[in-house]
Amino acid sequence: MNDGDRLERYAELAVRVGANVQEGQEVFVHGLVEHAELIRALTRQAYRAGASYVNVDYRDQHVKRAMIEIGPDEALTYSPEWLKKLAETTAGNAQLGTTGDPEPELLADLD
């Protein structure tokens, strides 16, 4: 089995068993941009499982670092209304997220 096949099987397990995606269900996938290959596989498998729509939210630690270093102090605790509404709207959806920081030291030197 090659790496691509292994990734697809892992994604299928996460979608069908972990998230238990059902026919017609909306799915919300989130993770770091470095995990794009896995997120794409999760998206494919969610559609194969019958998802009606898959939304992907990529996060970028370099953008977060810029906010911490350069942005106003208020940005650290600010949560826009549209983000709160998104959380409420997607609460009943199947959710899949990737974890694991590919650059664990990126934010280490920040206070």
Residue ranges and their predicted role:
Residues 1-111:
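Active-site bordering "gate/hinge" segments
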